[in-house]
Amino acid sequence: MKIQSPFGPKIGIIKIPKKIISKINKEVDIILNNKSKLKKSDYSEKLVGEVKQEIEISRTFINKFLSKFLKENIKKFIKKSLNKNLNTFKVKNFWVVRQFKNEYNPIHYHSGSLSG
């Protein structure tokens, strides 16, 4: 992990394994191809962007495929950037933004200790 601070806050730079990207893409495809899942997972009303498809990823999926990877890397980020140990870790939300021509995300703030 590389740590950079180009404009103030520290930014951790990591490479997400293709296996994890593939899992996320497959999950999004499953949701997109199931109207009831798509309606249940529609996150667009909760977000600030002018984007038609923002899809919430389920807690089950997060726990099964993402939590370990995220925790390991957040732990490294906290240690390298603040020289502190991570005490607690919880993914509050996880969503995928499918952004198309003329859609945009304005400047906005994410609550919580870390976002990305």
Regions found by a protein language model. Give the residues of each.
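A short coil-to-beta-strand element that immediately follows conserved catalytic motifs
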Residues: 83-94
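Catalytic core of non-heme Fe(II) oxygenases with the double-stranded beta-helix
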Residues: 93-116
